[in-house]
A protein has these predicted regions:
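Conserved acetyl-CoA-binding loop of GNAT-fold acetyltransferases
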Residues: 124-133
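Conserved acetyl-CoA binding element of GNAT-fold acetyltransferases
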Residues: 70-81, 135
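Conserved beta-strand-loop-alpha-helix junction that forms the acyl-donor binding cleft
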Residues: 109-119, 138, 142
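Conserved GNAT acetyl-CoA-binding A-motif
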Residues: 93, 100-112
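Hydrophobic adenine-recognition pocket in adenosine-nucleotide-binding enzymes
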Residues: 5, 77-79, 112, 128
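Acetyl-CoA-dependent GNAT
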Residues: 4-8, 15-70, 75, 94
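Conserved acetyl-CoA-binding loop-helix of GNAT-fold acetyltransferases
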Residues: 76-79, 85-98, 125
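Conserved N-terminal entry element of GNAT/NAT acetyltransferase domains
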Residues: 1-8, 143-147
Length: 147
């Protein structure tokens, strides 16, 4: 079942992030981040539930640029390995595309790591074009950043 995320989904999303994405973050921290997103109208989390358990999710946000109309950006998409190749990722992607279209967004954009070799194939199959390859820089202000 495809639906909007709620606070009860925090644990399942935390497990997916740990097992499938490699993000080892304390549950309480992850839960607080998810709740903050749920309370932010510029962001959405959609989940796919099977037998009462969230097996996949997508997180997207409004992406405002000074030189383009607003877009939505996908910040995360993950499906438990056992449930992959069953159309769940595509259903989640369509939820974001519908939200983007309904809100008047110009496009949906995303970035994916070069180490995620299946992701480019998936996104191209869903009509996404590779726009450019780029470097990603980050400067941390605390020592407890795990992603």
């Amino acid at each position: 079942m495809l639906r909007v995320c709620n606070e009860k989904d925090c644990h399942d999303i935390w497990v997916i992030n740990r097992e499938e994405m490699g993000y080892d973050v304390d549950f309480e921290i992850a839960q607080n981040h998810i709740i903050n997103v749920l309370n932010d109208d510029s962001q959405r989390i959609f989940v796919y539930e099977v037998d009462g358990r969230v097996v996949g999710y997508i997180h997207a946000a409004t992406y405002n640029l000074l030189y383009s109309d607003p877009m939505k950006t996908i910040l995360g998409l993950a499906v438990l390995k056992k449930y992959r190749r069953n159309g769940i990722g595509g259903c989640l992607l369509l939820m974001v595309e519908d939200w983007a279209s309904d809100s008047g967004a110009e496009a949906v954009q995303l970035s994916t790591g070069k180490d995620r070799d299946v992701a480019p194939i998936f996104y191209k199959a869903w009509g996404y074009d590779l726009r450019k390859e780029q470097y990603s820089f980050i400067k941390h202000f605390t020592d407890n950043y795990n992603a």
